[in-house]
Amino acid sequence: MSWHGHLQLHYRHDPNEDRTVAHDRHHGPLRVLQRLYPEGPSICHHVLVHPPGGIVGGDTLEVDLDLAPGSHALITTPGATRYYRSAGEVARQQVRARLAEGSRLEWLPLETIAYDACIAENSLRFEIAPGAMMMGWDLLALGLPAAGKPWQRGSYLQQLELPGIWLERARIDAADARLLDSPLGWAGQRVLGTFWLAGGDALPKGLSDALIESARALIGDSALAATAGVSAPHANTVVLRVLAPRVEPAMHLLGAIRAAWRSIAWHLDPCVPRIWRT
């Protein structure tokens, strides 16, 4: 039996209380687990959960986000998103977000794991209006090699789109040794992390430079210094990429850079989501 889960989240700013008010509607097993305000009323932390625990062939999960002017949402998950083996059907996740002027979004799900023989598609689209800004990450692990469960069969299609700013579409096949093992590709690593900060306008030159400088300093102090890098591929965004043998060191690096960028760009404390500590 396949599942179709659809979650709609709408955020608006209440100026009387300086509060981000959230409304949600869901169909199927995808829903909000927690709504928290650990930083005060202006920033809403949402924890999304898919109760069946994983996505199998034939399943489709859709998330639609709408951020009104002045709202600020942080969205994460309590655990990894897991694509399990498929008998031939595609498992899909689609995330679509619209950020109005003056809104902020932090898209910070925990890692995605592609299990052996999965056939998966993951599509992320973030429309950012002038005056809005977001930071987000995507962390993909191919199999669980440390547990003796390598990714030997299957495919994974990843699309990440910031219209007018950045479009990336990559199809990864488990049989593509040239991509996965070449020093010009994954270099034998099995975890790829991407972290970005983007605005609806060109980032001020001083801000872009400060973000890159801080990330390079943290990369230089990391065990992943040889497989991580940061650049500004477009005037509106700064992007970091990292390859790692396991999820933990990649997530540690992304978390450190997220804390630095949050302070530099928004003058906010790191505020690690509580669900990550449980």
UniProtKB/Swiss-Prot annotation:
Single GO term (MF): nickel cation binding
Pfam families linked: UreD (PF01774)
InterPro entries: UreD (IPR002669)
Keywords recorded for this protein, A-Z: Chaperone, Cytoplasm, Nickel insertion
Disulfide bonds: none
Domain of life: Bacteria
Chief localisation class: cytoplasm
Record family assignment: Belongs to the UreD family.
Record function comment: Required for maturation of urease via the functional incorporation of the urease nickel metallocenter.
UniProt name for this protein: Urease accessory protein UreD
Phylogenetic placement of the source organism: Bacteria, Pseudomonadati, Pseudomonadota, Betaproteobacteria, Burkholderiales
